């Protein structure tokens, strides 16, 4: 029996977002009161992220024939992340220099109210490469799961998977238990996703109700430049990578349209992580590749965040008339190559990394963060959407490079033009 269009999660979330925008615009006070709906949905998603990553990574690694393949997958993924995120940083830098959205604003940094950004500056002071690397190691396994730290859970899951693999037949019972537990967890995910329209409605109503459409108009040029840049990056850069890998970026976007709408409503790519793990397996990527690439990409492959960081930093310099010659911009790029890896796929993380970057560069006024604080919530949506698409493309690319991609299945799912591609897994 053909399913009704009204049962489509895609349509339900789209309608919910539209209603949320209207409510927030016409009844802003009521709209801001809808915040708990969005927060509640995101908390439900975060509740199951740690067990999903653990189960996916452990069963993926333990089920592989060779441990060398795991190391090769990780190395290829990290190399891909570094190259593509660097391209994203450079594109953001080039576009903001060409369009110059901040030129002519002539803002005095000393006149800005920095109270609102003080909390971000304080968090940014805690950022650092050594601190970031040490934070990957959990103080306790229970603590890693309790805090929902993706990289900490991933580290433990990889070690657990290796140990389980070395047990061989003795570990089969544990493997079966974890595999069965994973099926239960994905059942829980399906239950939670039925609440996605409510969560998207609440988050969008709050955003529009609190910040208003007027905020968009006030600094609309920067927002427009950023959205255009993200769109160009997805179509041109990720599109070219997708084409070289054997699939269409537009078909892939259509394939993950429900996840994209959930991200649009919540402004966090993390909210779609559990479903992305499942969908990337269904598109033909081996579980071991999906389990490594997707969670790692949430800290090392945030293309949208990379574009945002360079554009926002230079915009602040332009708006406050801070000097930014070619060497200052090269310094900014080098700093961002490191600091951008500390961002996670959660709302607000990009703003914290931006604060850390301004502090590290030195000659850019941290007070300038106050300029974009009001519109950061709107820009975070484009960041999250680009991050999600980028991590999905990365998974397919790495899977193909590691010969862990069922290309026949990929073409069947995405409707690719070449249905006669070989199946390297079979």
UniProtKB/Swiss-Prot annotation:
TM region(s), chain numbering: 4-24, 44-64, 76-96, 142-162, 184-204, 222-242, 326-346, 352-372
Function field: Responsible for the transport of dicarboxylates such as succinate, fumarate, and malate from the periplasm across the membrane.
Membrane association type: Multi-pass membrane protein
GO cellular component terms attached to this protein's record: plasma membrane
UniProt name for this protein: C4-dicarboxylate transport protein
Listed GO MF terms: fumarate transmembrane transporter activity; malate:proton symporter activity; succinate transmembrane transporter activity
Pfam families reported in the protein's UniProt record: SDF (PF00375)
Chief place of localization: membrane
Similarity annotation: Belongs to the dicarboxylate/amino acid:cation symporter (DAACS) (TC 2.A.23) family.
Organism, as annotated: Edwardsiella ictaluri (strain 93-146)
Source domain of life: Bacteria
Keywords: Cell inner membrane, Cell membrane, Membrane, Symport, Transmembrane, Transmembrane helix, Transport
Cysteine disulfide links: none
Matches recorded under Gene3D superfamilies: Sodium:dicarboxylate symporter (1.10.3860.10)
Entry's localization field: Cell inner membrane
HAMAP family: C4_dicarb_transport (MF_01300)
Biological process per Gene Ontology, one example term: L-aspartate transmembrane transport
């Amino acid at each position: 029996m053909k399913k009704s269009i009204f049962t489509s999660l895609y349509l339900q979330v789209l309608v919910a977002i539209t209603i949320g925008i209207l409510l927030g615009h016409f009844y802003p006070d009521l709209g801001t009161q809808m915040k708990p709906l969005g927060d509640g949905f995101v908390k439900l998603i975060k509740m199951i992220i740690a067990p999903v990553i653990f189960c996916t990574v452990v069963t993926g690694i333990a089920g592989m024939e060779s441990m060398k393949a795991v190391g090769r997958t990780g190395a290829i993924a990290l190399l891909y992340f570094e190259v593509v995120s660097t391209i994203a940083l450079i594109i953001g830098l080039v576009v903001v220099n060409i369009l110059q959205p901040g030129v002519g604003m002539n803002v005095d940094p000393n006149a800005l109210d920095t109270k609102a950004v003080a909390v971000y500056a304080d968090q940014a002071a805690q950022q650092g490469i050594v601190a970031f690397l040490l934070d990957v190691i959990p103080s306790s396994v229970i603590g890693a799961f309790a805090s929902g730290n993706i990289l900490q859970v991933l580290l433990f899951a990889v070690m657990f998977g290796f140990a389980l693999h070395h047990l061989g037949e003795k570990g089969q019972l544990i493997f079966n238990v974890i595999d069965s537990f994973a099926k239960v967890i994905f059942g829980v995910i399906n239950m939670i996703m039925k609440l996605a329209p409510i969560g998207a409605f609440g988050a969008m109503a709050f955003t529009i109700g609190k910040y208003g459409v007027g905020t968009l108009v006030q600094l609309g040029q920067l927002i427009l430049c950023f959205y255009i840049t993200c769109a160009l990056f997805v179509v041109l850069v990720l599109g070219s990578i997708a084409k070289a890998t054997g699939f269409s970026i537009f078909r892939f976007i259509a394939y993950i349209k429900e996840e994209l709408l959930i991200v649009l409503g919540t402004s966090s790519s993390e909210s779609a992580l559990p479903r992305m793990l499942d969908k990337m397996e269904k598109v033909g990527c081996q579980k071991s590749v999906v389990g490594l690439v997707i969670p790692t990409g949430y800290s090392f492959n945030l293309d949208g965040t990379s574009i945002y960081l360079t554009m926002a930093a230079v915009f602040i310099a332009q708006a406050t008339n801070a000097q930014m010659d070619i060497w200052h911009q090269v310094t900014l790029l080098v700093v961002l190559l490191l600091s951008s890896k500390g961002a996670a796929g959660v709302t607000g993380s990009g703003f914290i990394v931006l604060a850390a970057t301004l502090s590290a560069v030195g000659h850019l006024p941290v007070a300038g963060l106050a300029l974009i604080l009001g519109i950061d919530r709107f820009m975070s949506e484009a960041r999250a959407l680009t991050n999600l698409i980028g991590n999905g493309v990365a998974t397919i690319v790495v899977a193909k490079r590691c010969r862990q991609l069922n290309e026949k299945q990929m073409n069947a799912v995405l409707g690719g033009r070449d249905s006669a591609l070989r199946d390297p897994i079979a």
